[in-house]
């Protein structure tokens, strides 16, 4: 039995299976990723380790296999197989904005401690094989990782001027025809969309 609460991310794999990332604040850990077939029938669930912090999720093919990339606003990002086996898991990046970041620990479900500066909300895949992570509930930066999940840059930060962000949530690489390719960021608290180059320059 899964108690359904806040749904924050939905992704679809090549077979049409739908992966829903949700967050519950129950005292007992529950699976945070629930998988359905294309008709809405339950297939499986997993991810008790994401209990209380489940947020963005997306699917990408690496080589001949698809993987899930997951954001947990308890302070880390992860890559897993489609059945939930963790490939890697990373906490706050070791760059200037996060030098004082501490490992995130949920002492009371639903309540966040002070000093936890990395609280990622969503992910987008870059054309070079890397990816971006939006630190929506943390320090409001967009962090760029290469294809090996190594941090190679960051931009944004808290503010309401051009290129600054407050609670960046949805992000995606927009390469539709007739448009300049750009990373689009849903700058939630500023109630706007912002556009950036792949290198992080504000457009």
Spans of model-derived segments:
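A short loop-to-beta-strand structural motif that recurs across blades of beta-propeller domains
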Residues: 30-34, 75-78, 140-144, 192-194
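Secretory-pathway ectodomains
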Residues: 58, 66-73, 77-80, 131
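Beta-propeller domains
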Residues: 8, 15, 19-47
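Beta-propeller fold detector
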Residues: 44-47, 87-104, 152-157, 203
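Mature catalytic domains of secreted/periplasmic carbohydrate-active enzymes
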Residues: 28-29, 60-61, 79-81, 86
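Beta-rich, blade/repeat-based domains predominating
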Residues: 2-15, 31, 50-66, 99-130, ...
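Conserved beta-strand positions in repeat-built beta-propeller and related beta-rich domains
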Residues: 20-27, 68-73, 115, 133-136, ...
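Short loop/turn segments that connect beta-strands within beta-propeller blades
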Residues: 36-41, 81-85, 146-150, 197-201
């Amino acid at each position: 039995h899964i108690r359904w609460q806040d749904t924050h991310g939905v992704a679809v794999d090549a077979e049409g299976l739908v992966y829903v990332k949700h967050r519950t604040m129950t005292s007992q850990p529950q699976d945070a990723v629930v998988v359905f077939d294309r008709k809405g029938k339950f297939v499986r669930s997993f991810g008790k380790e994401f209990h209380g912090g489940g947020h963005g999720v997306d699917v990408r093919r690496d080589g001949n296999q698809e993987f899930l990339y997951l954001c947990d606003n308890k302070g880390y990002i992860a890559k897993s197989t489609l059945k939930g086996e963790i490939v890697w898991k990373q906490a706050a990046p070791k760059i200037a904005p996060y030098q004082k970041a501490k490992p995130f620990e949920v002492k009371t479900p639903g309540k966040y401690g002070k000093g936890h500066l990395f609280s990622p909300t969503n992910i987008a895949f870059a054309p070079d094989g890397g990816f971006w992570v939006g630190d929506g509930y943390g320090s409001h930066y967009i962090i760029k990782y290469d294809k090996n999940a190594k941090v190679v840059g960051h931009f944004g930060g808290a503010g309401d001027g051009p290129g600054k962000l407050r609670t960046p949530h949805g992000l995606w690489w927009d390469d539709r025809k007739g448009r300049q390719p750009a990373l689009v960021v849903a700058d939630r608290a500023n109630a706007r969309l912002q556009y950036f180059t792949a290198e992080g320059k504000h457009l």
